[in-house]
Structure formats: C-alpha cells, structure tokens
Amino acid sequence: MTDVSRKIRAWGRRLMIGTAAAVVLPGLVGLAGGAATAGAFSRPGLPVEYLQVPSPSMGRDIKVQFQSGGNNSPAVYLLDGLRAQDDYNGWDINTPAFEWYYQSGLSIVMPVGGQSSFYSDWYSPACGKAGCQTYKWETLLTSELPQWLSANRAVKPTGSAAIGLSMAGSSAMILAAYHPQQFIYAGSLSALLDPSQGMGPSLIGLAMGDAGGYKAADMWGPSSDPAWERNDPTQQIPKLVANNTRLWVYCGNGTPNELGGANIPAEFLENFVRSSNLKFQDAYNAAGGHNAVFNFPPNGTHSWEYWGAQLNAMKGDLQSSLGAG
C-alpha cells in the first residue's frame, strides 16, 4: 500500500469516527446524567432555603437553593449539568450535598435552571423548545447573586468556590479565571476542558440542540469567534496559574466500579472527555501550576455517583482553602 493510500484510509477512519460521534453524542448526553425525577433529596430538618433572587441582567427572579454556613461564611457554588431543571438543582436531586456540608462553615449555593447555558453570558437570547429567555449567568454568579447573598444572608462575597459537573466543570474554571477575587477555588468533574478545539464546538452545538433545542451560535457565536477560546479552560490556564486558583480536577475512564453507573452512555461519555482532562493537566504543569488536585482513577463513569463521591472527598480541601470557620 502506498503512503497516499494509507493517508486516505486514515482520514477516512477519522471522518467515520467523527461522524459517528456527532450523531451519537447528543443522544448519549441525554441519557447520561440526564433529567432526574423531580423531588429534592435534602431531608426535613436541614436549614435549606428556597430563595428568589432578582436578576436585572436576566429580567427575572432566579431560584436558588441555599444553606447557610454562618455569618461571613465563604460560599460553595454547586453548578448543574447540561440538563439542569427548573425545579431543583441536580446536586440536591441526586446527592445529599446539603447533608454532607451541614455545619461545615461553608454556605452552599445551588442556582436552579440554566439548561445548556454553560453558566455564560450569551450573545443572543437563548431560544429553545420552551421559548426564548435571556441568559446572563456569568453576570448573575459574579455580581448579582454574591451581592444579594452578602446583603441578605451575610455570606462572604469573595473567596468562594465554584464546583461543576460535565458542562459546568468548564464553567467553574472560567468563572475562576476571570473573577479571581470571588472564586479562589474551582472544581471540575468530568468536563470537556478544551471545548474550542477540534470538533468541540460542533459536538457542543449538537448536545445543546438535544438538551432543550438551544443553539451554540446564540451563546458564543461561530466556532471562529474569540468567545470560544475565552470560555476554554485549557486556553485560560495562564490566568488560573497567575491567579494561583486552587483546582480540583476529576475524570474517570468509563469503567464502572462498585459505585455504579454501568451503562453505555455514561461509560462512553466519561471515556470521551478524559483525554481533554489529561491534556489540561500536562498544559497546567508546563505552565508552572502547582495548586491543583488531579484525580484520574482507572474507573468511573459519567454519572452522579462519582460526582457526589468527589464532592464529599473535597470537603476538607474546600474548608482549608476557603478558610471555613
């Protein structure tokens, strides 16, 4: 076989793989970590509040689940996945997060809603199957919400953490990169950490279309727009290193263990995003970063059992890093 023939066959295989991923990925996203049955986990007796926080930038009140860690306590913002619901935050639906962090000295903040938003300020109205609305989630999380919590719930407005799974893992990194005084800690669990690269924009667009009928171009424009790299954690490593942001980065390899998550969508998705996490680690180390926990075990699927275990495991690190009393 000639070199030319080999190259043609190689490119053919790549095209087939890319096409298959483009077709399969949105459906898998819909199944893995998808919409859960409505009904929060938090047991009766926990001091969980259901707040309505005004958002002038979005023109409506935003529901926020909240548990106080005490006066002037630092906040941990728990951000939801691609299929975030409008009734409860996925962290409450799928994990006992409020229970784990009760009396921890940390205020737990769970914004509700934001399906397919990437917790970003969108260029255009977010128009999907349920109609159109304004998405200015970065403004909410970095200005409106911390100011409201400081004034109304005595939450420390700076020195917070952002923790996200899947879609929101990259969002947590970006919030910390551009708002280092507010977010000194970012946790990314099973996220695609190079969304601007390769087929990332196309696959994200397909997934967003499947999860609510949204368009990636309404969010960050075409793939050539600078907003894609602006919201790419790997591209923003220099900022994270310069800020000395504390990072907690987790990704499994698609192999289930005793925690569960043994289904093809969850296994495929976790394996799919793992390489971007390994590349992020290499780039972070090469940039001189030295304030991160990287956890890449030989197991773990794209499911809540593993994300909950990570949130529980990082509790001590969060308390130490944020100076919880």
Swiss-Prot record:
Annotated signal sequence range: 1-40
Q: Which residues form the active site?
A: S166, E270, H302
Q: Does the keyword Nucleotide-binding apply?
A: no
- UniProt-listed Enzyme Commission number(s): 2.3.1.122, 2.3.1.20
Molecular function terms from GO: diacylglycerol O-acyltransferase activity; trehalose O-mycolyltransferase activity
Question: Which keywords fit this entry according to its UniProt record?
Answer: Acyltransferase, Disulfide bond, Secreted, Signal, Transferase
| Disulfide-bonded cysteines | C127-C132
Cellular location(s): Secreted
Q: Name one Pfam family in it.
A: Esterase
Question: Where does this protein hold substrate?
Answer: L82, R83, S166, D194, F272, V273, R274, S275, K279, H302, S303, W304
Q: What is the catalytic activity of this protein?
A: 2 alpha,alpha'-trehalose 6-mycolate = alpha,alpha'-trehalose 6,6'-bismycolate + alpha,alpha-trehalose; an acyl-CoA + a 1,2-diacyl-sn-glycerol = a triacyl-sn-glycerol + CoA
What's this protein's family per the entry? Belongs to the mycobacterial A85 antigen family.
The UniProt function text for this chain reads: The antigen 85 proteins (FbpA, FbpB, FbpC) are responsible for the high affinity of mycobacteria for fibronectin, a large adhesive glycoprotein, which facilitates the attachment of Mycobacteria to murine alveolar macrophages (AMs). They also help to maintain the integrity of the cell wall by catalyzing the transfer of mycolic acids to cell wall arabinogalactan and through the synthesis of alpha,alpha-trehalose dimycolate (TDM, cord factor).
Query: Which PANTHER family does the UniProt record give?
Result: DIACYLGLYCEROL ACYLTRANSFERASE_MYCOLYLTRANSFERASE AG85A, ENTEROCHELIN ESTERASE-RELATED
Task: State what protein this is by name.
Answer: Diacylglycerol acyltransferase/mycolyltransferase Ag85B
Organism from which the protein derives: Mycobacterium bovis (strain BCG / Pasteur 1173P2)
Classification lineage:
Bacteria, Bacillati, Actinomycetota, Actinomycetes, Mycobacteriales
User: What gene is behind this protein?
Assistant: fbpB
